[in-house]
Amino acid sequence: MKKFFLTAAALMGAASMFAQGWPANYEGVMLQGFYWDSYRASKWQNLEAQADDLAPYFSLVWVPQSANCTSSERSMGYDDLYWFSNYNSSFGNEAELRSMISTFKSKGIGTIADVVINHRKTLTSWTDFPVETYRGLTYKMNSTDICSDDDKGGTLTWANKQTPKVSLSSNKDTGDDWDGMRDLDHNSSNVQNVVA
């Protein structure tokens, strides 16, 4: 799963650079605009206020995951619940995020976002992902998008006790198991569609 995440992040970063017309032999410098538990230091408004200071030295600022987690104001974003419809995070709201990106862009700084696509939080039970609509398309993950060995088999045990029984994917996790949230089956065409 780690290899998949790193590969996906690298590809998305490379794709966005080409989409912005950056040269193939890009030699810019990226600043990581966050560190663990940097809720205050990495707020969108704080990063935006530093744009003039950053512009002479950095071409990109890597920002933390921006989707809503609903857990608390002290989440680094790795317990993401909403991917498309709610960008209110520990770092600020959607308007502040857009303002930061716009300011960075006006100063010649690109923005690259950390993304979490290997696991996802659910609403109230182990398998109820939120339904989201983005640009006219509705996205829904199902119990069959969860790896069969999620939570060291705990999710399967839970699923088998439900009436009616809840089905999971027949595929095992392709990375490390993490029992904090549901591990997603990246061999699932639905997961691939939602992630892409």
Residue ranges of each PLM-predicted region?
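Positively charged n-region of N-terminal signal peptides that target proteins for export
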Residues: 1-4
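Sec/Tat signal peptide C-region and signal peptidase I cleavage site
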Residues: 12-19
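Substrate-binding/active-site clefts of carbohydrate-active enzymes
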Residues: 21-29, 34-52, 56-196
